[in-house]
Regions:
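Soluble catalytic regions of large protease machineries
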Residues: 27-29, 37-43, 49-215
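Short loop/turn hinge sites at secondary-structure boundaries
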Residues: 5-6, 113
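Active-site scaffold of zinc-dependent metalloenzymes
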Residues: 14-32
């Protein structure tokens, strides 16, 4: 980027641009999205940004955009973890990271709650979807949900940050007879996995509810 712009030195902006290109993709040269989609993307990224700024002790927000790119992203929030927490993540850092990851979904819910309450409709479909909430939420947060579940599973099963104790599920890939006997065989292992799954679900729900309340 510095050579392309005829610069004599590499600037911080050049580094950020190169990092974006590698991790996120090239910006799209065509904008054919409707205003409603752009508004949704703006809310989504604002959710991530607001929470990342709230947890400024852990994160530095580098760039926020609602411009689409060729990698398929409608927009993105680029932030980095401060050096201290890159090498030694704390329990609080992981929880903050989890909340930030779900900020986009929480912001979408807030947007459509406001949208639905402000626009009357002559069509009542409540009987069709009577037991389903947040019907206008999009699939745009799918990558965020994957990230959140990954963080939550590490929190519970790898780092021992939950009530189940200092159990590392990764050790299950290296079985030995003494451990199998101590854990009660396959039945105990299955029970432990169920406990981990429940704890992960609880943690993700906690993070989402916290993100929603803040936004």
């Amino acid at each position: 980027y510095s050579v392309r712009n005829n610069l004599t030195e590499i600037t911080y902006s050049n580094i950020v641009d190169a990092y974006e290109k590698i991790t996120i993709g090239l910006p799209s040269s065509v904008e054919n999205r409707g205003d409603d989609v752009i508004e949704l993307v703006a809310y989504h990224e604002a959710g991530h940004t607001l929470l990342a700024l709230l947890f400024s002790e852990f994160f530095d927000v580098k760039r926020v955009t609602i411009n689409a790119n060729k990698g398929g992203a409608g927009g993105y929030t680029l932030f980095t973890t401060k050096e201290k927490y890159q090498s030694l993540p704390t329990k609080k850092y992981l929880l903050a990271n989890l909340i930030v990851a779900l900020g986009g979904r929480a912001a979408e819910v807030v947007l459509y709650e406001n949208y639905q309450s402000s626009i009357p409709s002559n069509y009542d479909n409540s009987e069709v979807f009577y037991n389903i909430t947040d019907l206008d939420i999009t699939t745009g947060a799918s990558a965020d949900l994957q990230q959140a579940n990954s963080i939550a599973r590490q929190y519970v099963a790898q780092f021992g940050f939950d009530m189940i104790g200092l159990y590392d599920s990764s050790s299950s890939s290296k079985p030995f007879l003494g451990r199998d006997m101590a854990m009660g065989g396959d039945k105990m292992s299955d029970d432990t996995k169920k406990i981990i799954d429940c704890k992960v679900t609880e943690l993700v729900e906690y993070a989402y509810n916290t993100a929603y309340e803040i936004i």
